[in-house]
């Protein structure tokens, strides 16, 4: 969204941050804000690409949630590309950028660990030193530890979907358009919808929900018998009560919500063993809350 929209606003209360996942901690920062400044790409994708994390949501989903979560009046979201220019900005230059883009800025909302400028030299106190009013939100906790995007990614990587969902305040989900597979599932009586998605998930089998009902999903390369069906991890969703998805809307993105991890992905020696495991997975999915 153009920054010109913000220039027409009076008394802008601006939330700043990357907000990957828009988790419960982020929502504390967003509370009371009527505008958001965020980056489209993760700063580490420029600063140190080898350390850039797998993201919890794509940029358009993040912008949509930042606009609407916890507010009756949609927020203006100013999403910009993080570039080498931003990476090398002195803190005072970033302050000038804020004043230029948001001349009617009343207050900045941020988390306690938010940093800006080259080498993260700018802090919330830096903004105060330049005359800004700053609201620093306290960490939200889950258990004895602070909620963070990093902690959520770690939970998902371990298969602890329930913990991740608790910190997100919603079910972790991915969205994508179905792609054609090799038809193995159909031959076994368990047809799947296949999605090429990048997610910080442990490889394995999950209980999921979709707009078409409950499902069992395998995230991995599908090493059923012999060679893997996919070179990179793919999400294969079997809808346990059936659905002719092709007749519904085959080109429409499908949202898949994760309820819990069932088991690691594994290779089977024969078709009968695989079919028995599919039946057990379906039974577990039906009994899941």
Regions found by a protein language model. Give the residues of each.
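Conserved beta-strand termini and adjacent loop/short-helix elements that scaffold enzyme active sites
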Residues: 1-3, 39, 79-82, 137-139, ...
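N-terminal catalytic cores of NTP/NDP-binding nucleotidyl/phosphoryl-transfer enzymes
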Residues: 3-60, 64
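A general structural motif
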Residues: 10, 33, 74, 104-105, ...
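Residue-level signal for inorganic ion chemistry
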Residues: 23, 66, 108, 164, ...
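A non-catalytic, amphipathic alpha-helix used as a structural packing/dimerization or gating element
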Residues: 28, 61, 163-170, 273-284
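N-terminal Rossmann-like or analogous alpha/beta NTP/dinucleotide-binding catalytic cores
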Residues: 44-132
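Glycine-rich, Lys/Arg-enriched anion-binding loops that position phosphate/diphosphate groups
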Residues: 123, 130-224
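Phosphate/ribose-recognition catalytic cores of enzymes acting on nucleotide-derived substrates
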Residues: 182-289
